[in-house]
From Swiss-Prot:
Keyword terms, alphabetized: Cytoplasm, Initiation factor, Protein biosynthesis
Ribonucleoprotein found in the keyword field: no
Similarity annotation: Belongs to the eIF-3 subunit F family.
Protein's job: Component of the eukaryotic translation initiation factor 3 (eIF-3) complex, which is involved in protein synthesis of a specialized repertoire of mRNAs and, together with other initiation factors, stimulates binding of mRNA and methionyl-tRNAi to the 40S ribosome. The eIF-3 complex specifically targets and initiates translation of a subset of mRNAs involved in cell proliferation.
Pfam families per the UniProt record, alphabetical: JAB, MitMem_reg
Organism domain of life: Eukaryota
GO biological-process terms attached to the record: formation of cytoplasmic translation initiation complex
Stated name of the protein: Eukaryotic translation initiation factor 3 subunit F
Length: 300
């Protein structure tokens, strides 16, 4: 599929970006890449299910693109094979196309952004794969995301890094390219942060609804204590106040209706607590009825 990479000697280094279509921002204007945890979990799941003889797994990145940033929201695996003597790569293009069609039926707002690899090494095969995905993302450049799966690497851990590519030389071959690093950030919503915190718990265990509510209240209380400590330190002049934090606190406090006394607030909380218990009771009742119905069917 490809010849061995050869670089001609020259006194100058030419970085050639493919020309962009008129009116379309080029990837050189990208300032950052934001990655959602869902995409990283998909990549790790693919890696754990790989053939042990594979040095790495690859797949397609999906998400949204703006003028200056790309947001990686999803990913799916693409079967492949590769060799180093000579440098060759084989991708299951039909599998890629079928998976992409299925995904776009559910999320038509997402586009192909590039590809991922679970090996941080960038070689000639990486350049060939990058060239393939560049055709998928044209006129934009393809994003290449690498995920370090070496858990023994305490310095970097599961390091995530994104790149774009630039051809070397005026008449360069697809495999003759340089990968240029981009700022990469992990983007998490509040529900995702909560889910990740529970996944990172050392000893997950089954807890009752009341225990879960108690843990949530204790977490809220701890956060309120942190906020009060910060505000008191700012008022005392111990630390310099952050305007962004002040605006956020003001907006948060503004959500609470004004004029609520302690008795009314407690009454509202008790009402909400009763609703929680009622929902929990009804869900257990439905579960018990379903189990009973299943056993009766087996008896008949």
């Amino acid at each position: 599929m490809a010849e061995k990479s050869t670089l001609a000697a020259s006194s100058a280094l030419h970085l050639s970006f493919p020309p962009a279509a008129s009116g379309v921002f080029h990837s050189r204007s990208i300032t950052a890449v934001k990655v959602h945890p869902v995409a990283l979990f998909s990549i790790l799941d693919h890696y754990l299910r790989r053939d042990v003889s594979q040095p790495r797994v690859i797949g397609t990145l999906l998400g949204t693109r703006s003028e200056s940033e790309v947001e990686v929201r999803n990913a799916f695996a693409v079967p492949h094979g590769e060799s180093q003597d000579p440098w060759q790569i084989h991708l299951d293009a039909e599998h890629h196309r079928r998976m992409l069609d299925l995904h776009l039926r559910v999320r038509p707002d997402e586009v192909v952004l590039g590809w991922y690899s679970t090996n941080t090494e960038l070689n000639s095969n990486s350049a060939l794969i990058q060239d393939h995905y560049s055709r998928e993302t044209a006129p934009h450049q393809a994003i290449h995301l690498t995920l370090n799966t070496n858990v023994a690497d305490e310095a970097n851990g599961l390091g995530v890094q994104c790149y774009v590519s630039a051809l070397l030389g005026a008449m360069a071959k697809p495999e003759d390219c340089a990968f240029l690093s981009l700022p990469t950030h992990l983007l998490m919503s509040t529900p995702e942060q909560t889910a990740l915190r529970h996944l990172a718990a050392p000893k997950p265990q089954n807890i009752t609804d009341l225990d879960a509510l108690k843990a949530s209240l204790e977490d809220v209380q701890a956060k309120l204590d942190r906020v009060l400590t910060y505000v008191r330190r700012v008022l005392a002049g111990e630390v310099e106040g952050d305007k962004a934090v002040g605006r956020y606190l003001s907006d948060t406090i503004g959500v609470v209706p004004a004029g609520l006394d302690e008795s009314l607030l407690e009454s509202l909380f008790q009402s909400h607590l009763q609703d929680v218990f009622m929902v929990s009771y009804l869900s257990k009742l439905v579960s018990a009825q379903a189990e009973m119905s299943t056993r009766l069917v087996l008896l008949t």
